[in-house]
Design a protein with these regions (language model features):
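Conserved beta-strand-loop-beta-strand hairpin that lines the nucleotide-binding pocket
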Residues: 1-2, 47-132
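Bergerat-fold GHKL ATPase/HATPase_c domain
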Residues: 1-39, 129-132
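Conserved ATP-binding N-box helix of the HATPase_c
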Residues: 29-56
Length: 132
């Protein structure tokens, strides 16, 4: 099992996503799985930023034989940054989602099985149709 930790500020969404992308590449996560995890990470980091742009977030990416887990830890008041909309990338493309508030930390974990059949392209196309 390989694991990488990133400490960053949620106000730097693009920079944080670049760090996560680099971590997923270093962990040899497939392109399709990386795209889904990055889409989910973008939603989550944006939600954290909207709630507390001045705080910090620790992101951990961990790969096992079964898939990849990305965990977001944010200090502060109870706040679950997981998108609730059923058409969100996180809800549609992640195989497991868990949240806990422990010791003043909001911890959200998303897991995607290796080569999951949950296709991010379908979610992107669905969102484009809704926007029109």
């Amino acid at each position: 099992m390989d694991k990488l930790n990133i400490s960053t500020f949620p106000g730097c969404v693009e920079k944080t996503l670049e760090y996560i992308k680099t971590a997923l590449k270093a962990l040899h996560v497939s392109a399709a799985d990386s795209e889904a995890l990055l889409g989910s990470a973008g939603e989550i980091i944006s939600a954290i930023c909207a709630a507390d742009a001045n705080g910090s977030v620790i992101v951990s990416a961990e790969k096992s034989g079964k898939g990849c887990c990305v965990q977001f830890m944010h200090l502060g008041a109870l706040f679950n940054p997981c998108p609730k909309a059923p058409d969100s990338i996180t809800q549609k493309c992640m195989d497991e989602i868990s949240f806990e508030f422990k010791y003043g930390r909001n911890v959200l974990s998303v897991f995607r099985r290796a080569n999951s059949d949950k296709n991010i392209q379908e979610v992107k196309e669905m969102k484009e149709i809704q926007i029109r």
